[in-house]
Amino acid sequence: MPKELKELKDYLSVLKRPDARSVVVYKKKSKGGLLSTKFKVRCSRYLYTFSVPNQVKAAKVEATIPSHLEKKVITNKKN
């Protein structure tokens, strides 16, 4: 069962942990046209999720991902 993080400070502390392996970034457009971004961090025991509704803030959060973690970006493309 994934653990949901509510605070940015908690998300950043999980990224710095030595057991953090990879980050998957999901960028999904909602019906209203807003872009919602979810960050999923895989650690040894849990999958931690962090959701950001603001696109500008999401870009800043994505820039804070350390380079030693494997990063995968998935966008929702429906025609």
Curated annotation (Swiss-Prot):
Keywords tagged on the record: Ribonucleoprotein, Ribosomal protein
GO molecular function: structural constituent of ribosome
Pfam families: Ribosomal_L38e
Biological processes annotated in GO: protein-RNA complex assembly; translation
GO cellular component: cytosolic large ribosomal subunit
Taxonomy, superkingdom: Eukaryota
Family classification: Belongs to the eukaryotic ribosomal protein eL38 family.
Identification of the protein by name: Large ribosomal subunit protein eL38
Originating organism: Theileria parva (East coast fever infection agent)
Gene: RPL38
